[in-house]
């Protein structure tokens, strides 16, 4: 993809990767900004944070002992870093702080680059998701990035995404379809496919409490860390289908009424027919192959849910994760999401009702 461009979705309410959803327009997603050194988003990924921490450790080791010990940075969990930050000796905490500060500066530079895109020029708020967000170090990095941006004249608010990363990519699926598809039901099946994990779950609406679906939550979650097993594509699809069939039984056992809908969040640029144009390189096997269509495979495996034909819709995973924040984005017109994970997922939205006004 050329510099400063992003995927432009198709304008069809029930198409995969659609630009027009019931409450928002998806203006752009999966922007792949490049420099001579590589993708801009790689400067604000989980690997980037680990590389920054490694660099600080190497510098300190030249002067004496590493306060973090001998454990490789990639093996130090977010919980361990959080504990070091709060309870570690001053030098260990200072090293973690240094990594957070440098990462925040890099993240701010990445966001400034995104703000130069025409689709992003009016953004008022950015929600930040992904695995790093689910930690105190991630929250501090987001907060520090927000301060850096405002200090440099950018009136953009940054907020950590509300839901846990394992849940946000599932909950967002309830906003992929018009409300009439969900009417008379209390839950859906949702799938979140990532470079390391595949998640499937039952998302319960709780719409009697909150009509805007802000009380929606994950009733049941199945998670498989496929990166540990390195499966073939067909094995991964079959495992996912097993998850979904088990979840249908679980919903019935728990007295839930599933809507005839499966929502999918998947990395990459999603064509209107449900195939993946590009961006699936971290998935198990070749998901961009001609003739492979995940929504079609799931429809064949679950042709009906209850008494109705199954509707399956797939969109980019960052888009779906961002949609989980929709109930809390009603006071702004233009907003965006960035997900810090294997790479940097991204999407920009416009609230349709506010834009019309």
Where are these regions (language model features)?
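Gly/Thr-rich phosphate-binding beta-strand-loop-beta motif of the actin/hexokinase/Hsp70
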Residues: 2, 7-69, 73, 173-174, ...
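Short loop/turn segments at strand-loop or loop-helix junctions that form parts
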Residues: 48-62, 76-89, 128-131, 194, ...
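Alpha-helix termini
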Residues: 64, 114-122, 149-153, 178-183, ...
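Adenine-nucleotide phosphate-binding core of ATP-dependent small-molecule kinases
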Residues: 70-122, 160-166, 223-258
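Glycine-rich phosphate-binding loops at beta-strand->alpha-helix junctions
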Residues: 100, 106, 118-148, 268-270
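Glycine-rich phosphate-binding loop and adjoining helix at the ATP-binding site
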Residues: 134-164, 224-238, 261, 270-335, ...
